[in-house]
Swiss-Prot record:
Gene behind this protein: gpsA
Active-site residues from the entry: K194
Organism field: Shewanella oneidensis (strain ATCC 700550 / JCM 31522 / CIP 106686 / LMG 19005 / NCIMB 14063 / MR-1)
Residues that coordinate or bind NADPH: S14, Y15, H35, K109, A142, R258, V282, E284
PANTHER family: GLYCEROL-3-PHOSPHATE DEHYDROGENASE (PTHR11728), GLYCEROL-3-PHOSPHATE DEHYDROGENASE [NAD(+)] 2, CHLOROPLASTIC (PTHR11728:SF1)
Enzyme category, top tier: oxidoreductase
Keywords: Cytoplasm, Lipid biosynthesis, Lipid metabolism, NAD, NADP, Nucleotide-binding, Oxidoreductase, Phospholipid biosynthesis, Phospholipid metabolism
Cellular localisation: Cytoplasm
EC number(s) from the headed UniProt entry: 1.1.1.94
Enzymatic reactions: sn-glycerol 3-phosphate + NAD(+) = dihydroxyacetone phosphate + NADH + H(+); sn-glycerol 3-phosphate + NADP(+) = dihydroxyacetone phosphate + NADPH + H(+)
UniProt binding sites for sn-glycerol 3-phosphate: K109, G138, T140, K194, D247, S257, R258, N259
Name the record gives this protein: Glycerol-3-phosphate dehydrogenase [NAD(P)+]
A GO CC term assigned to this protein in UniProt: cytosol
Record family assignment: Belongs to the NAD-dependent glycerol-3-phosphate dehydrogenase family.
Pathway(s) of this molecule: Membrane lipid metabolism; glycerophospholipid metabolism
Amino acid sequence: MNNSADITVLGAGSYGTALAISLASNGHKTLLWGHDPAHMQTLAEDKCNQAFLPGIAFPECLHIEADLAKALAASNNVLVVVPSHVFGTVLAQAKPLLRQDARIVWATKGLEPETGRLLQDVARDVLGEQYPLAVLSGPTFAKELAMGLPTAISVAGTCPQFTAELVELLHSPKRLRVYANDDFIGLQLGGAVKNVIAIGAGMSDGIGFGANARTALITRGLVELTRLGEALGASTATFMGMAGLGDLVLTCTDNQSRNRRFGLALGKGCDVDTAQVEIGQVVEGYRNTKEVFTLAKRLGVEMPITEQIYQVLYQGKSPVDAAKELLGREKKSETPTQ
C-alpha cells in the first residue's frame, strides 16, 4: 500500500505538535491527529497550535486530520505522542485501523499506570508481535523544537531498518540531530525516571536549598536511574547519553519543565492538587513517580530519592521532611564496589 503521507502523528498536544512541525519542516508530508475534534478544527483554521505553541506557524507540509481512520490509512509510519496513562487506550483505538505494514514509534515518556510496566509491554499486549516498535527520547522542550532551535534526541527500536529510517525522517542539519541507539529498554526508562527526579529538583529549589543541593540530587538521581536500568537489562552507557543524563539535566534545571515547576510549587508550600492546577497541563511526573516506585519495589531496587518523592505526592509527607530523611540516611561510599 502506498503512502499519501510520510508519517502520521497521534497526539496534538505541545510535544506531538512540535514533532509534527519538525518533521514537516524537513519537507515530509505529516498528518497530525488529536482526540478532540473541536481542537483539531481550530488547528486547521489557525494553522498553528495557539493553545500549546502560540505564534508558531505550521509548515506547508503539516496537515490536520481529525479522522483517525484516514490518518492511519495515510502512512505506515505512526508516531504516538500522548500521555502515558492513555497510551494503551490510544493504541487499542488505533489497532483495528492500522495498516498491515504499519510501524509504531512513540515519544511518550512514562510507564504503565499502576503496574509500572514499560510501554513496549503495553504495546505488545495491545498490538501483538506484528508491528516493528521504536521509541524517541532525549532532552527536548516542545517550544524550542517547534521554533527550530538546535536539539538532539535518540531513537531505538526492535527493527534496525525502522530505526535507521526514523533517523533519516527526523534528522535535520539545521534543527534536529538524531542518534541511533540499540538500547530499547534504556531509552524508555530514562524518559520516565527523569520526570520523577525533576519534581525532586523543583522541590529542592522551592524550599530554597540552592544549586549544591540540586546538583547532588541530579547526580544521585542518575544513580537511581542506572540501578533500575541495570535490573531491567538496559545498558548503563545509555544513561550517560541523551535519554539519561541529557534529559535529566534539562528537566531538572529549566522552568520550561512542568515537572520541575510542579516540584517548585510543592517546595513553596502548595499541596499536590493546587500545584497541579497551577501548572495547567499534564504533569507526567506525578503518575510516573508511582509507576517508577512500584517497579523499583517489585524489582528490589533501592531508589531513596524516588521513595521520598512518592511519599510527598501520595502519603502527605512535607518536602522539608523528605529532604531531612534523605540527608539523614546512613553514610555510605559513593563507589558501588565498596
